[in-house]
Swiss-Prot record:
Residue ranges, annotated region (RNA-binding): 1-81
Keyword Phosphoprotein: yes
Annotated InterPro entries: Rotavirus_NSP1 (IPR002148)
Lineage, opening ranks: Viruses, Riboviria, Orthornavirae, Duplornaviricota, Resentoviricetes
Residue span of region Important for cytoskeleton localization: 82-176
Protein name from the UniProt record: Non-structural protein 1
Chain ranges for the short sequence motif pLxIS motif as given in the UniProt record: 480-483
Region span, Interaction with host IRF3: 317-486
Length: 486
């Protein structure tokens, strides 16, 4: 049983504030939810279980029970998950406010302990102070958190997470902020709480406290396409697809790291909750994570033999050729932008090969083929540049004054001609490695200019940022027929 979940279940009965704040989906009647996919910790109830995607950010961090409330750590409504979420620079005062909130919602004193013991002793087998009956009293106050970095903003979701060594397939990693606060001071707070417990429970409380307060922070993870809803990934190849998300909001915005102080004034907190509502946003999929997913999918279907062929059609329109025909039934080719990039890259590469190598047919086996498979994924800059360099070397460049050149005197299509003029100012007769890098990047940047893209989608924006973008109608970046250059 998850300690935090149990604590919320029992403590929500002690007063009106707790009844509202500690209400978790996992402790209520179960409702159907999307199929679970990843193992990890639910940010809402802190239990380790199978996770489903969040309706607010499309990442996997909700269990199938908590998903019914649709709470996200990026909401503006001050529910418990939001009040436990801190952002960027966390100060000692911020952590003091968090500890005060814990003491307000999960107090341990003689009156509370006696109340729980009396309500638990309903049967002979419950007379002993066994941990399974008093799990809710064994939640220490720690500064344990799950952290994530989203385009320069670091979020810390504090809570009590059991079984830290269990499998974690989410983009969140454990962080310990006790050094920002004070170890001895936090020890004293927990020892005071522990002193009210029966002796039989004190040792278990101490073990839990020290195991969750003295660990070393993990290395922060990189967010990838695997961490987002499968439904979003499946629809990425539709250029007009928009991600639909919902956020729990209030009319007033407060200091992000100061949200945990709201429980100090109960009447003001309830007045604030009266303005709570759900806002709906339609979000573009444009970001580096999703762009790289598209380019990687296209890379799996590359037919490198086209660069030595004599086909008069573009690379994606070749039919009935054993070595050059691609399977257009794959979803990745539904995005005309990917097809444009593929056609122009291979038209340019074929012109390079035909200008510098004596190869007459696509059935020939050439060393250059093994390096062409990585020419689309420009998001992996180091790997991409290595591939382009190897292709350049396969063309047997001529060195003049310490600079290597290759010929460029084969015909190319009008799209490539226009891009040549835009990138190098003319249609050249000779090219250096740097020229080729610039031209190939220009072909890809025409449709997916990753230089000006966020790493993660705008679904990971806070509500305030989403509202600002919606005012300027910028949550949807561009119509599907207009390129990044245009």
């Amino acid at each position: 049983m998850a300690t935090f979940k149990d604590a919320c279940y029992y403590y929500k009965r002690i007063n009106k504030l707790n009844h509202v704040v500690l209400k978790l989906g996992v402790n209520d009647t179960w409702r159907p939810s999307p199929p679970t996919k990843y193992k990890g910790w639910c940010l809402d109830c802190c239990q380790h279980t199978d996770l489903t995607y969040c309706q607010g950010c499309t990442m996997y961090h909700d269990c199938q029970w908590c998903s019914q409330y649709g709470r996200c750590f990026l909401d503006s409504e001050p529910h418990l998950l939001r009040m436990r979420t801190f952002k960027n620079e966390v100060t000692k005062n911020d952590l003091m406010n968090l500890i005060d909130m814990y003491n307000t919602l999960f107090p341990i004193n003689q009156k509370i302990v006696d109340k729980f013991i009396n309500s638990t002793r309903q049967h002979k087998c419950r007379n002993e102070c066994m941990t399974q009956w008093y799990n809710h009293l064994l939640m220490p106050i720690t500064l344990q958190s799950l952290s994530i970095e989203l385009d320069g903003d670091v979020y810390y979701v504090f809570g009590y997470y059991d079984s830290m060594s269990d499998i974690n397939q989410t983009p969140f990693s454990f962080a310990n902020l006790i050094d920002i606060y004070d170890k001895l001071l936090l020890d004293n707070i927990n020892f005071n709480r522990m002193s009210f417990l029966p002796v039989a429970l004190q040792q278990e409380y101490a073990l839990r406290y020290f195991s969750k307060s003295r660990f070393i922070s993990e290395k922060r993870k990189c967010v990838s396409d695997l961490h987002f809803s499968a439904n979003v990934i499946e629809n990425l190849h539709n250029p007009s697809f928009k991600i639909q998300i919902t956020r729990n909001c209030i009319e007033l915005s407060s200091d992000w790291n100061g949200a945990c102080k709201l429980v100090e004034d109960v009447s003001a907190y309830f007045d604030m909750l009266k303005t709570s509502h759900i806002e709906f946003y339609s979000i573009s999929t444009r970001c580096r994570v999703f762009t790289q997913h598209k380019l990687k999918m296209a890379s799996k279907h590359i037919k490198p033999n086209y660069v030595t062929s004599n086909h008069r059609t573009s690379a994606t329109e070749v039919h009935n050729c054993k070595w050059c025909s691609i399977n257009n039934s794959y979803a990745v080719w539904n995005d005309f932008r990917v097809k444009k990039i593929y056609d122009n890259i291979f038209n340019f590469l074929r012109a390079l090969v035909k200008s510098n190598a004596n190869v007459g047919h696509c059935s020939s086996q050439e060393k250059i083929y093994e390096h062409i498979e990585d020419v689309l994924d420009v998001c992996d800059d180091e790997k991409w540049k290595t591939a382009v360099t190897e292709i350049f070397n396969c063309l047997e460049p001529v060195e003049l004054d310490a600079v290597k050149y290759v010929l460029f005197n084969h015909e190319v299509n009008w799209d490539v001609i226009n891009l040549l003029v835009q990138s190098v100012g003319k249609v050249p007769q000779i090219l250096t490695l740097n020229d080729i890098v610039i031209i190939m990047k220009s072909i890809i940047y025409e449709w997916f200019d990753i230089r000006y893209m966020r790493n993660t989608p705008m679904t990971t924006f806070t509500v305030d940022k989403l509202r600002q973008l919606c005012t300027g109608v910028k949550t949807v970046d561009y119509d599907s027929g207009i390129s990044d250059v245009e």
